[in-house]
Amino acid sequence: MRPALTDYQHLASGKVRELYRIDGGHLLFVATDRISAYDHILKSEIPDKGRVLTAMSVFFFDYLSRTAAVSNHLAGPPDDERIPEEVLGRALVVEQLEMLPVEAVARGYLTGSGLIDYQQTGTVCGIALPSGLVEASRFDEPLFTPATKAELGEHDVNISFDDVVGLIGAERAEELRDRTLRTYSQGAAHALTRGIIVADTKFEFGVDARGELKLADEVFTPDSSRYWRADDYAEGQVQNSFDKQFVRNWLTGPDSGWDRHGDQPPPPLPPDIVDATRARYIEAYERISGLRFDDWIGVSA
C-alpha cells in the first residue's frame, strides 16, 4: 500500500513544485499544474502539465546518464513505492543535495534576457559577442550564462562567470560551466534529431555527501527551456515555440489587457490558451522522447 502525501513533512512550495521529506536523505519532488510567467504564479493551471514536466525530466535524466555520463539526483523509478497514489506520475523520489546558489543557464541562440543584455551592452553575462546579432541568432558555440537564484516573486539576475567563482570557488565554477555546456550540447543535439531546437535552457545542480556534482530539479522541460520548431526557424524573428513562451506572448499581447510593468497580477488564461499550452507541452514530450504521453503513469487531468 502506498503512503499518503500527508505522511510526509512538507518542506517548501515553489512556483510550480512542492517539496516533501521522505527520510533523512530523500525528498519527494512534486510537480503541480501551476504555471508561472514574469515572476508571477498565474491563476490558471495547465492540466497534466506536472506530469509532462516529470515525464520529460525522467526521459532526459536517463538519456544524459547513458550518453554523457551526467549523474543526477534520482533515487528511484517513476513508480517508486514511496510515491503516494495521488501524485503518481508527477512526483519523483530524489536524493537530498546541497544545491548550488546559481542557475546554470546554457544558450545556443540569442533571445530573451540575453538579447536584451546584448542590445544594451554588446555582451551576455560579461561575454563579448560580435556586432550585428539579432533575435534568434545562433552562437558559434553555446554560452554559459549563469544567473542568481531569486526568491519567489523576485527576478533572476544574469551574472558573470567571475561572480560564480565568488559564490562557489574557482574549481567548482569551472566544473559547473563544463557540466552545463556538456549537458546542453548533448540534449540539444538529440532534440534537433527530432525537429526541435533547444534555444536555451536552465539547469540546477547540487552536491552530494561525497562531493559529487549532480544534475537536479528538472531537465530540458518546456518550463526550463525554449523549444523552437527546426523546420521553420528563421533568424531575425520570433520563433514558433513549444514552451511557455506561448503564454508569455499572450500575456504581453493586446488580448490580455495586462501591463507587465504595472502593479496588477496577470489575468486568468482563456480556455483556448490553456488548451493550446497543454497541447504544445505534450507535443514537445512526444516528439523529443518518441513516447506516447497517454502511456505515462498517473491519472490524466
UniProtKB/Swiss-Prot annotation:
Pfam families: SAICAR_synt (PF01259). Keywords: ATP-binding, Ligase, Nucleotide-binding, Purine biosynthesis. Pathway: Purine metabolism; IMP biosynthesis via de novo pathway; 5-amino-1-(5-phospho-D-ribosyl)imidazole-4-carboxamide from 5-amino-1-(5-phospho-D-ribosyl)imidazole-4-carboxylate: step 1/2. One of its GO terms (biological process) is 'de novo' IMP biosynthetic process. GO terms for molecular function: ATP binding; phosphoribosylaminoimidazolesuccinocarboxamide synthase activity. Its EC number is 6.3.2.6. NCBIfam families: PRK13961.1, purC. This is Phosphoribosylaminoimidazole-succinocarboxamide synthase.
